[in-house]
Amino acid sequence: MNKFVSQSTIDTFFDGKHADPFSVLGMHETSNGIEVRVLLPDAEKVFVLSKETKNVLCELSRVDERGFFAGVVPNTHSFFAYQLEVYWGNEAQVIEDPYAFHPMINELDNWLLAEGSHKRPYEILGAHFTECDNVAGVNFRLWAPNAKRVSVVGDFNYWDGRRHPMRFHQSSGIWELFLPKVSLGQLYKFELLDCHNQLRLKADPYAFSSQLRPDTASQIGALPEIVSMTEKRRKANQADQPISIYEVHLGSWRRNLENNFWLDYDQIAEELIPYVKDMGFTHIELLPLSEFPFDGSWGYQPIGLYSPTSRFGTAEGFKRLVNKAHKAGINVILDWVPGHFPSDTHGLVAFDGTALYEHADPKEGYHQDWNTLIYNYGRHEVKNYLASNALYWMERFGLDGIRVDAVASMIYRDYSREDGQWIPNQYGGRENLEAIEFLKQTNHLLGTEIPGVVSIAEESTSFAGVTHPPYEGGLGFHFKWNMGWMNDTLSYMKKDPIYRQHHHSQMTFGMVYQYSENFILPLSHDEVVHGKCSLLGKMPGDAWQKFANLRAYYGYMWGYPGKKLLFMGNEFAQGREWNYQESLDWYLLDEFHGGGWHKAVQDYVRDLNHIYQKNAPLFELDTDPQGFEWLVVDDYQNSVFVFERRSKKDERIIVISNFTPVLRQNYRFGVNIAGEYMEILNSDAQQYMGSNSTNTSKIVTEDIESHNKAQSISIDIPPLATVYLKLHKVKKVRKMRKTSKVEDTAVKTEKKIAKGKTTRTKKTVADTVSEATEVKPKKTVTKRAVVKKVKNAEVIAESTSVENNVS
């Protein structure tokens, strides 16, 4: 029995219940001199060595057969640097004593973490390579204020929670321990004795690397180096720049052909980046990459927020992918999920025996739609954990933005809940005031620490001010997904063209609220799963009409105000729904399998993107009403839409869409600027497998009034197609219109009548003008059937009777 340590105290160590190991273990002053005490289960002998001379100073006595050793070092009365020589059977090992090191967290960090205002808690908490007293090792820190004991366990200590209990900082609730000679890649977890005396084995919330499911341990990894934001990347995120986003799920974009297994980050980068560059996309948006246990969640139920998923390799590999994208001039956005987390036992749930990260009341803390838990945004440490995570991804991996998932579920307490299933806020309202404040805080943190980083909200309600600055009462996002536009327009496109005239407003209503927020038009992964069909599958008609409808829709979308987002596979009109367990159907791009149809859509999207990037009217004034004007908004009978886009320099592009399978010949509409227009895009062109009803010659305005405009043009609008006309040359407008000559003649006739030189007819001047300007209907034109031979199939577009437009 040791004179200075009771048996009951020793028992608490072996029972895993001692809360203050540094008060007992290590070096201590006693009346007999300096005593060294160590806990080394299974050790047979332990000697104390002088670190300076390497001489043996004393052998420690085995105070307890289970492995508690203690002994007074002769002739010493002050602390000194020492090592331990430990004999495990016949094998001797010289080690550092973890309990010989002083606390490493400084007072400022401890105070900021306690307050929940540390900008970068990931630099303090978690596992960090460092040196203490010139000894290299890893410093482990964990926030678990209600735990009775916390130990770090891993393959370096046989996962034995008795061996390395940690030091507790009462003021912040943080546990800390420095372990020498622990190396990169080693596995670890934290073993907690919770407030109910239950053992919990938890992954590190701040781990920089994690095991691949079904394993759940954290891995010791280095904190990635900072990647600075560049002016080029910053500019590419601005609202007056072209932003066309390619949304990607890395696990199913492409897979290994031999075993259907994932490609790693480097393999993906080798293929994905050149493809995106060639296709003309400006940004890549990656579905969530924080480590997650369930493949079927697609990453939207993460546990390791600071760990890039090991499915595709290491954090360094992911960083190389981002760097390769930047070298190609492509910005990278990451889907980020701060709204909820899964209830897997190794994660955040009941972390220290209490509802530490979540709400205790299920009415606030449980998400019934997804069977997940909701973060407690009212707790400063939780807000700090989440907000700094967004900064971590931007700063340490050089990402250019985040897209925040499911914002509506965060900001409304009654989201997807019936009456009685939710708790009002302090004012009796339904808004989650703490979540709203958290979002503002996160956007402010990103904006001040990395100016130029873009934040995007997936917000599906009409919550006001999502993209307005907080000082105006907004949330501070830069862009918001326009879910209303997406739902309305897809609903319209699903309908048979014969019924579209009754739903005309679905394509125009978006302009009512277009300038209330900064919008992105999203055709995301959510629209091609869970029985919703692929985008191609949503389109009505036979094969020819399906592809024509989709091309026309894309053209309308790329011409409409708002940045663009397209989920992978939609750029070549994949026919089946997205399956996260398989690669995209790239074989459809082969002539044999796809008959050229899918390749044509791919070519079309590529051309759309490049035209979009090169023409400022299509993007520069997306958030300014001066950049848009309807030219034909009410032609519901023909399902025709015409609008004009403008740039800051007053360049003009006119977008014309015809959503019926009827060729609109000599369709006349008014324009603002007289001059020559050139057709720069036609979704019905032959190279896109259309019927090739194009306007190849210059289109010159005429002095004919139409749609309340003095100048107008007349073109053929192809069936189920979108056409872009670009103002090529401005001309001076003649003072008199063609109808004015008729009016002139009629007036002269009236004067002759007055002088008796001719006889008045019953026709008035107005009658004369009306007759002269009347357009006689032409004969019905029949558009021949378009036939495209495909291997083993024949795709036929039905012959359609087309009436001439007389507007």
UniProtKB/Swiss-Prot annotation:
Pathway: Glycan biosynthesis; glycogen biosynthesis. GO terms for cellular component: cytosol. Keywords: Carbohydrate metabolism, Glycogen biosynthesis, Glycogen metabolism, Glycosyltransferase, Transferase. It catalyses: Transfers a segment of a (1->4)-alpha-D-glucan chain to a primary hydroxy group in a similar glucan chain. The active site is at 405 (nucleophile), 458 (proton donor). It holds the Pfam family GlgB_N. It is an enzyme of class 2 (transferase). GO terms for biological process: glycogen biosynthetic process. InterPro entries: A-amylase/branching_C, Branching_enzy, GlgB, GlgB_N, GlgB_N_E_set_prok, Glyco_hydro_13_cat_dom, Glyco_hydro_13_N, Glyco_hydro_b. It comes from the Bacteria. One of its GO terms (molecular function) is hydrolase activity, hydrolyzing O-glycosyl compounds. Its EC number is 2.4.1.18. Belongs to the glycosyl hydrolase 13 family. GlgB subfamily. Monomer. Catalyzes the formation of the alpha-1,6-glucosidic linkages in glycogen by scission of a 1,4-alpha-linked oligosaccharide from growing alpha-1,4-glucan chains and the subsequent attachment of the oligosaccharide to the alpha-1,6 position. This is 1,4-alpha-glucan branching enzyme GlgB. The gene is glgB.
